[in-house]
């Protein structure tokens, strides 16, 4: 999966002219309980910054919007600050902290550990994240 993401990103870079955007001026912001998602579109790619406050948990804050058993968005993300505890549907779990890069397939829950907001920059799975399911 990582090779696929890298190939896709390389293709986008090779086929486009230079473009610079800032997550500080997002194209779209989605707010949900104890968090928000800021999206920028660059070329054909979508990059999202997720900000999750203490007490945020996917299964209580986003699940009501997604209406799925667990998070079905795959993620390839850089952890900027805070700690996220991630539990995959198969029972695998891990704390991700500032400086970590995580690749998460579909089927997981996550929550903020401690009193510091967790911030991630995601290069793959945020295009449909926290959208109201129909």
Predicted regions and their residues:
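A short, N-terminal "cap"/entry segment at the start of jelly-roll beta-barrel domains
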Residues: 5-51, 59
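Ligand-binding loop in jelly-roll beta-barrel domains
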Residues: 105-130
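Glyoxalase I/VOC metalloenzyme domain signal
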Residues: 24, 54-56, 125-134
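Short, conserved beta-strand element in jelly-roll/cupin
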Residues: 68-86
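Short acidic-glycine-tyrosine-enriched beta hairpin
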Residues: 88-107
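Conserved short histidine dyad/triad with adjacent acidic residue
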Residues: 49-70
């Amino acid at each position: 999966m990582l090779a696929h993401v890298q190939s896709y990103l390389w293709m986008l870079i090779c086929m486009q002219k230079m473009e610079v955007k800032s997550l500080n001026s997002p194209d779209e912001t989605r707010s949900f309980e104890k968090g928000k998602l800021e999206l920028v579109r660059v070329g054909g790619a979508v990059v999202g910054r997720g900000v999750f406050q203490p007490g945020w948990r996917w299964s209580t804050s986003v699940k009501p919007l997604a209406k799925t058993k667990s998070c079905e968005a795959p993620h390839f993300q850089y952890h900027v600050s805070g700690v996220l505890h991630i539990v995959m549907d198969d029972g695998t779990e891990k704390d991700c902290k500032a400086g970590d890069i995580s690749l998460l397939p579909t089927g997981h829950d996550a929550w903020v550990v401690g009193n510091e907001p967790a911030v991630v920059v995601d290069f793959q799975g945020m295009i449909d994240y926290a959208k109201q399911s129909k």
